[in-house]
């Protein structure tokens, strides 16, 4: 039987996997800011879809990536990209850099996404495996709810600060290491 910390570290990887829309509470403020820079509302809304396209691309590239880098390195890189790529808008509020930020976030999530499931499937068996896979799904929902709630409090400071929720990937990285 695996220790509690090992199980928690694997499950915590799923906390960030469905977080791409968490900062969407700030969308009206972002539309106002980027409209002043000459961007249409649809272009600003596209920023939130962009991460999903990057995740999809990474999932398609995953068989190649698995041959090039280890599972551990993939997870470490993924968490670092989520933390630093995802939180870039805290510092940089230009459309082009937020665009890059959303791509980096998607790449980071994509590096972890399939691994979060496969690690559990490879590490556990039987009832324990089923329980861990169920908990993993619950951790996704908990992560999304928690990050969205935090964004609700942060948005009053300013839209760019809502992206600081992606820094929660750093404590997850610390637990994983």
Show the residue positions of the predicted features.
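Conserved MFS/SLC helix-loop-helix module at the cytosolic interface between two early adjacent transmembrane helices
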Residues: 57-95
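Interfacial helix-cap and linker-helix signal at transmembrane-aqueous boundaries
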Residues: 30-31, 35, 65-66, 150-158
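Cytoplasmic helix-loop-helix junction between adjacent transmembrane helices
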Residues: 95, 101-139
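MFS 12-TM fold signature
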Residues: 55, 81-86, 105, 169-173
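Residue-level signature of mid-helix packing/kink "hotspots" within the transmembrane helices
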Residues: 21, 51-60, 144-145
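Extracellular/periplasmic helix-loop-helix junction of adjacent transmembrane segments
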Residues: 27-56
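Helix-loop-helix hairpin linking two adjacent transmembrane segments in secondary transporters
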Residues: 97, 127, 135-177
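Extracytoplasmic
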Residues: 5-37, 62
